[in-house]
């Protein structure tokens, strides 16, 4: 569906190793895994009435520097870039190529190959299995009621736009789990609830519209889906800014759990894909389809004050042996349909929350730190990384 979008969402994995990265060895690692990870070595082919992915046989180059080359203009039409500087490796990619869980196996594979070359390890580097795409038409037949207007509509809200400022929050994972256990809720619920407290104070709003993403691979029976396989929800919450977590944790947990039920997830996917299918079926030039899609996305979209995406352990499969070579891991994604975007990963017992903030007002890091500390969660860092 992202082919039709005017503005593509770019994601970043930022991996800090203990030692300086050797660009030549990183290039060798990328070349070695190429035959094992065909999905990622593709390009978009633009036809008169449609666009599709096709294999790309051009050279795929590792570059040096923190700044990503323009994708796909400066990457030989590849939809990702791999670059490094100092001790850090950067992966940048278009979200329509893969979501976070879809990209993690490739990132893990490249790191395994690099460590084998750099440190003489013997990590297995095996071909990544690929599940075929699901049929959205069958999904729509299963849930025809999902296409009724206003099925999941919230009151529209205004969101901030512009270049975001970056904020980083680091939390002790064990203390968050303890806070969740005290309330009898999921750790993600505790995380979301406390973020609602901090964001409510920062935005000075008594009612928030929060958003979160849910992975459908297990629900759809597609564990090896490399493509984008998530849904998003936008849900309201009142009174979090002036309340303790205990006052609303159970209700928040019930709402999140309800929306994570398999049937609800499939229904939501049908909702999201319905308009995409209708646009695809139009017998019109691609540029017209893009305009129709953008108009429909604007009219039917439900922007949120903020969204939270929890990746957890970033490596797939999980590998404590590989993690030993990694000092830090950060995930950055531009806010899409929200004023704030938070990506959370877990490594070495630390939750790292990378926040992109379009509000352009100082104080968010401090507001979140106060909210987490008040609920007994140990805050290891709360930093505004860009000048306000």
Predicted regions and their residues:
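Acyl activation and transfer enzymes in specialized metabolism, enriched
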Residues: 19-35, 92-108, 168-204, 353-355, ...
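Histidine-centered acyl-transfer/condensation active-site motif
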Residues: 69-120, 124-136, 345-362, 372
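Acyl-thioester-dependent acyl-group transfer interface
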Residues: 1-49, 56-81, 200-388
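Short, charge-rich amphipathic segments
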Residues: 37-45, 119-134, 174-190, 294-310
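Generic anion/oxyanion-binding catalytic loop in active/binding sites
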Residues: 15, 95, 165, 179-180, ...
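Non-catalytic, low-complexity flexible loops and terminal extensions
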Residues: 1, 97-179, 373-388
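Amphipathic alpha-helical scaffolding segments
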Residues: 108-111, 197, 210-213
């Amino acid at each position: 569906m992202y082919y039709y979008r005017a503005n593509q969402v770019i994601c970043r994995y930022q991996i800090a190793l203990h030692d300086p990265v050797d660009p030549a060895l990183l290039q060798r690692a990328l070349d070695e895994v190429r035959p094992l990870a065909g999905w990622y070595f593709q390009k978009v082919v633009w036809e008169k009435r449609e666009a599709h992915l096709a294999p790309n046989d051009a050279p795929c180059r590792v570059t040096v520097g923190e700044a990503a080359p323009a994708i796909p203009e400066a990457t030989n039409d590849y939809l990702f870039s791999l670059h490094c500087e100092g001790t850090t490796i950067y992966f940048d990619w278009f979200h329509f190529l893969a979501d976070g869980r879809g990209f993690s196996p490739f990132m893990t594979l490249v790191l395994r190959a690099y460590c084998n070359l750099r440190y003489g390890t013997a990590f297995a580097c095996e071909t990544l299995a690929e599940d075929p795409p699901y049929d959205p038409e069958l999904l729509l037949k299963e849930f025809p009621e999902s296409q009724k207007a206003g099925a999941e509509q919230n009151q529209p809200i205004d969101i901030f736009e512009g270049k975001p400022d970056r904020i980083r929050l680091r939390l002790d994972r064990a203390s968050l789990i303890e806070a969740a256990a005290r309330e009898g809720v999921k750790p993600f619920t505790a995380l979301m609830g406390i973020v609602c407290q901090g964001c409510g104070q920062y935005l000075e709003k008594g009612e928030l519209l929060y958003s979160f993403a849910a992975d459908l691979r297990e629900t759809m029976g597609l564990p090896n889906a490399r493509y984008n396989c998530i849904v998003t929800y936008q849900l309201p919450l009142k009174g979090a800014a002036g309340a303790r977590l205990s006052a609303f944790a159970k209700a928040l947990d019930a709402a999140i759990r309800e929306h994570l039920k398999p049937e609800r997830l499939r229904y939501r996917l049908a909702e999201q894909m319905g308009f995409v299918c209708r646009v695809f079926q139009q017998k019109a030039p691609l540029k017209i389809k893009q305009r129709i899609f953008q108009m429909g996305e604007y009219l039917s979209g439900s922007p949120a004050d903020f969204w939270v995406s929890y990746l957890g352990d970033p490596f797939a499969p999980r590998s404590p042996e590989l993690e030993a070579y990694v000092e830090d891991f950060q995930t950055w994604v531009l806010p899409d349909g929200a004023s704030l975007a938070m990506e959370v990963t877990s490594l070495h017992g630390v939750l790292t929350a990378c926040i992109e903030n379009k509000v352009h007002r100082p104080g968010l890091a401090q507001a979140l730190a106060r909210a987490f500390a008040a609920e007994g969660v140990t805050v290891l860092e709360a930093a505004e990384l860009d000048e306000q």
